[in-house]
Regions:
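Accessory RNA-recognition modules of RNA-modification enzymes
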Residues: 2-364, 369-371, 375, 383
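C-terminal substrate-binding/active-site "lid" region of AdoMet-derived donor-dependent transferases
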Residues: 377-381, 385-431
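Rossmann-like AdoMet/SAM-dependent catalytic core
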Residues: 433-436
């Protein structure tokens, strides 16, 4: 179950208002870091609760016409055996919104995430999948893993973190999920008056960098290393660009994708939403000089670096474009999920001339919203024998899984990784193979 999956409650929140406290039995975990509860027929998404508990829930959002109300567990009447004292003093109702599950033991956090992945695929794709969320190497206690942290700055120039679904800032003197090198920069002791936020990056190669926003005139470039069984290399990345925040994530994901796709010499491969070229470069080494790899990315901070990261592989090409634009997919005309686009009337876009008409392999690594129906249709039209889908949102993966099935691609393998311990976030890597034309 995910937020918004329940029918609209007549009259919105009914008799529940912000600040009300009610005692409820807690049901299953929901996608988004909540658990589901009900009070007199009203659906509640309750943070800081665990399945099977009885808690006192304080309503935090109750809007007219909303399908559910949001709440925080501010008291626990009957506790789950998996409940623990959060290690961070800033975790809990009304405090920092960065972590969702610090009140659960780490193994149970992964059970909750596993339940979410299975439920999303069942409900949105009609598939019953036997998958378990796996731990990544390192950070055995789920702390000290986050190598990139964005701190907000308050009116007094102090760095801190924001509350859940709020612009309100919580001043902090530590962040337990941050890599210790992030905190060693002294970012939380400095005066950042005049800045909106401060980014701190602790790369795998070299010293941490601190980037005030908007104060930085030139954003530093850092080096990130991948040291895997199937691929090793170093990458230039903008300190404000995208790179996986868990130190073991990039290596694990590249090895997993290569293992699933099994590239062959001479293959043509597409890396869609390519970032700085992580998967493109790994594929280029596998397909060799007789193969071809095309990386598609729109963020100029990433494409500049991708071209440098791929420079040693003449068989690669970086296409600077949004993936939908590269395929000639019309932009949506109204706000909505990428899977429910409404094409601009009368607007026709040309497919990018450097996209190959066919491909042997495709890597899809879309943003949280997913690839969407139209992009999936274009990917399927390439006729690739295999598609690897790297997903940071299980709901988007499930929707796109259904779209791929419509075009003859079946889910053949799925792995899920706890790349963000203490939070509700996770990463999935799925393999799809063409089963019909």
């Amino acid at each position: 179950m995910s937020e918004g999956s329940e029918p609209t409650v007549p009259g919105g929140a009914g008799d529940l208002s912000v600040g009300d406290e009610v005692e409820v039995e807690v049901g299953p975990v929901a996608h988004g870091g909540f658990c589901v509860a009900r009070h007199e027929g009203r659906v509640m998404f309750v943070r800081h609760a665990l399945p099977g508990e009885r808690v006192v829930a304080r309503v935090t959002e109750a809007r007219e016409g909303q399908r559910f109300v949001r709440a925080d567990a501010v008291g626990v009447t009957t506790a789950s055996p998996h409940r623990v004292q959060p290690p961070c003093p800033y975790a809990g109702p009304g405090r920092c919104g960065g972590c969702d599950f610090q009140h659960a033991d780490l193994a149970y956090q992964r059970e909750l995430k596993t339940a979410v992945v299975r439920e999303q695929l069942s409900r949105l794709a009609g598939l019953e999948v036997d998958v378990e969320v796996e731990a990544l190497p390192g950070a055995p206690d789920g702390l000290g893993w986050r190598t990139r942290v964005e701190f907000a700055v308050d009116e007094n120039g102090r760095a801190g973190l924001r509350k859940h679904r709020s612009h309100d800032l919580v001043p902090v003197d530590t962040c337990l999920i941050a890599d210790p090198r992030v905190l060693a920069t002294g970012v939380l002791e400095q005066d950042w008056a005049g800045e909106q936020s401060v980014d701190v990056v602790a790369p795998s190669v070299g010293e941490p960098v601190v980037v005030p926003v908007p104060g930085a005139e030139a954003v530093p470039v850092v080096t990130e290393a991948v040291r895997g069984d199937r691929f090793s290399g170093e990458f230039e990345v903008s300190a404000r660009g995208f790179w996986q925040v868990h130190p073991a994530a990039a290596t694990t994901f590249v090895d997993t994708v290569l293992g699933m796709l099994a590239p062959r010499a001479g293959d043509t491969a597409l890396d869609l939403y390519a970032g700085v070229g992580l998967f493109a470069r790994a594929l280029a080494e596998q397909v060799g000089p007789t193969g071809r790899v095309v990386a598609v990315e729109s963020d100029p901070r990433a494409t500049d670096k991708a071209e440098r990261n791929l420079a040693a592989h003449p068989s690669t090409l970086v296409v600077r474009a949004r993936v939908d634009d590269a395929f000639g997919v019309p932009r949506p005309t109204r706000k909505g999920s990428s899977g429910n686009r409404r094409a601009a009337r009368g607007r026709k876009l040309r497919r990018h001339p450097m996209l190959p008409p066919t491909a042997d392999l495709v890597v899809l690594d879309p943003p949280r919203t997913g690839a969407g129906r139209e992009v999936v249709a274009q990917v399927a039209a390439l006729g690739a024998r295999a598609v690897a889908y790297v997903a940071c949102d299980p709901a988007a993966l499930a929707r796109d899984t259904a779209y791929l099935a419509d075009h003859g691609y079946a889910l053949q393998a799925l792995r899920a990784f706890d790349a963000f311990p203490m939070t509700h976030h996770l990463e999935c890597i799925a393999l799809f193979e063409r089963t019909r034309t």
